[in-house]
């Protein structure tokens, strides 16, 4: 057999071997896909998840249905996902607390993130802003720290739930500023309501969760996380500027049950990365003050491990 025929046969064999994988990827999805969100409807996470679901539905020509299952810092939602087939038809909208913090918060956690879940795609990251109710009569972080030290343990703070990023962020603020506060956890949007009426007068939240209230003078921004000031809040200093090391991860990712076919994972990853270049989706990220994160599925594991290693000792 001459070299030309041999190379031709080898090329044919390579194509034949690749066809099953291509076919598998091209035939997904053939039915509706569920995107499970561990927060209530109307929250910032829910808004982002629905924006993504809309674009995936358009790309796949199949409905992507958002299902809200709040509670236990995502544990209920993840348990539900793990009870479904590992086929890519049930995806989980994860935050850093679900994947990196929960193993340290719950001794009997019913799942192991690195073992039971597989990364699909990173989505975005958000800075946090520390806000206060006008009823507290503080205008700067220094004002608040002085007040809290004069009233140790009297001031309460709201969060999105025990172990939520908003909870741990405030615990970090308390530790770094040398103050003590009472924690009042909420599910869904109750924390913002309690914050504005002064019942729990301070909170740390992603910018999108409080920006409308800041603009409406219903909340006072005191400091932001990150290395630089935010374009949306140029007059608000960073914790770093004020001498406090308060860095809080606020990323979101899509994960699936471990064992999901790699070809399906790769297709979903490629489609989400493509959606992040969509002008309408980028605009929606901008409305929520989110920075897109793109990369292969392995990026999810990298972020998850990085923040588990960093925050485990703190927790």
Q: Where on the chain are the PLM-derived regions?
A:
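N-terminal (or domain-start) structured segment
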Residues: 25-115, 154, 162, 177-204, ...
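Twin-arginine (Tat) signal peptide motif
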Residues: 1-11, 17-21
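Small-residue (glycine/proline)-centered packing/hinge motifs flanked by hydrophobic/aromatic residues
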Residues: 107-114, 228-246
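Solvent-exposed, polar/charged alpha-helical surfaces in well-ordered, non-transmembrane soluble domains
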Residues: 50, 54, 58, 79, ...
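An extracytoplasmic/periplasmic, membrane-proximal ligand-sensing/linker region
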Residues: 30-32, 176, 262-315
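Hinge/capping helix and adjacent helix->loop/strand transition within the periplasmic-binding protein
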Residues: 83-89, 104-191, 202, 239, ...
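A ligand-binding cleft/hinge motif common to bilobed small-molecule-binding domains
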Residues: 98-108, 171-176, 202-234, 312
């Amino acid at each position: 057999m001459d070299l030309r025929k041999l190379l031709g046969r080898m090329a044919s064999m390579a194509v034949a071997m690749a066809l099953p994988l291509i076919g598998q990827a091209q035939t997904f999805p053939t039915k509706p896909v569920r995107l499970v969100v561990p927060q209530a409807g109307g929250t910032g996470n829910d808004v982002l998840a629905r924006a993504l679901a809309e674009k995936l539905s358009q790309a796949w020509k199949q409905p992507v249905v958002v299902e809200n299952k709040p509670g236990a810092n995502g544990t209920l939602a993840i348990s539900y996902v793990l009870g479904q087939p590992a086929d890519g038809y049930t995806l989980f909208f994860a935050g850093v607390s679900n994947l990196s913090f929960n193993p340290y918060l719950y001794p009997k956690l019913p799942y192991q993130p690195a073992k039971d879940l597989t990364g699909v795609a990173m989505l975005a990251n958000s800075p946090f802003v520390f806000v206060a109710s006008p009823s507290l009569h503080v205008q700067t972080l220094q004002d608040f720290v002085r007040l809290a030290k004069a009233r140790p343990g009297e001031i309460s703070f709201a969060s999105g739930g025990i172990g939520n990023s908003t909870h741990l962020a405030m615990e970090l603020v308390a530790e770094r500023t040398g103050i003590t506060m009472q924690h009042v956890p909420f599910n869904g949007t109750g924390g913002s309501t309690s914050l504005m009426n002064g019942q729990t007068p301070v909170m740390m939240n992603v910018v999108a969760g409080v920006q409308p209230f800041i603009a409406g003078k219903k909340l006072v921004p005191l400091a932001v996380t990150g290395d630089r000031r935010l374009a949306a809040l140029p007059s608000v200093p960073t914790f770093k500027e004020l001498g406090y090391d308060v860095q809080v991860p606020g990323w979101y990712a899509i994960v699936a049950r471990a064992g999901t076919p790699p070809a399906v994972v790769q297709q979903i990853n490629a489609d989400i990365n493509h959606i992040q270049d969509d002008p309408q989706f980028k605009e929606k990220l901008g409305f929520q003050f989110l920075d897109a994160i793109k990369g292969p599925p392995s990026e999810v594991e990298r972020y998850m491990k990085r923040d588990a290693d960093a925050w485990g000792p703190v927790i």
